[in-house]
Regions:
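A structural "domain/chain start" motif
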Residues: 11-27
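Hydrophobic side chains in beta-strands
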Residues: 7, 21, 38-40, 134-135
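Proline-anchored loop/turn motifs at beta-strand termini and strand-loop-strand connectors
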Residues: 1-15
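Conserved polar/disulfide-associated segments of primarily extracytoplasmic proteins
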Residues: 22-106
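Generic structural hydrophobic/aromatic packing signal, biased to beta-strands
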Residues: 1, 19, 58, 116-118, ...
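Short glycine/proline-enriched turns and hinge-like loops at secondary-structure junctions
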Residues: 12, 30, 110-112
Length: 162
């Protein structure tokens, strides 16, 4: 970080992505299901508004880098819309956010809504670092896939990240 396709996001650090095996298979229950971690320098302010803005920039850039490669017609391109709110903090979180990302599924070239849970974490062993863990899937939050995503979050040990 900065992220190549979204340099306007004003953070410095490392991004780590984890894709489910069926992430890119539209017939799979795991389609578009993945998680990523931002291991950031400093303690940037984090609010639902900041998350909305950053993810709007992130997915605009992600889609933009796929337009030419996937030959997406101009009439199918739509601006991503994000909506987030702070929810009850999950165990081990400083803050937890929930929301949605409405965007172009550039694989199938049609609109998709991704549900998202975001975990903001601090770590005593990493005094001037911030961890933001994103869980993402188009499946409803009641689907079993979310347990798999949350297992990544609950098994995360920030003291091993330094």
């Amino acid at each position: 970080i900065p992220i190549e396709f979204a340099p306007q996001i004003p953070y410095h650090g490392v991004e780590d992505l984890r894709f489910t095996p069926g992430w890119g298979d539209s017939t799979s229950n795991e389609y578009w299901t993945y998680s990523f971690l931002w291991y950031l320098d400093g303690k940037p302010e984090t609010s639902s508004e900041i998350i909305e803005k950053n993810l709007q920039l992130y997915y605009t850039g992600l889609i933009g880098r796929n337009i030419e490669k996937r030959k997406i017609p101009a009439d199918r391109i739509l601006t991503p819309k994000t909506s987030f709110k702070e929810v009850k903090a999950s165990a081990g979180d400083v803050k937890t956010f929930g929301g949605t990302i409405y965007m172009l599924d550039y694989i199938e070239q049609k609109p998709i809504t991704l549900n998202c849970v975001i975990h903001l974490k601090n770590c005593a062993a990493s005094e001037n670092k911030t961890f933001i863990f994103y869980e993402i899937s188009p499946k409803p939050l009641t689907d079993g896939i979310w347990q798999q995503l949350d297992n990544l979050n609950t098994s995360f040990n920030c003291s091993k990240s330094d």
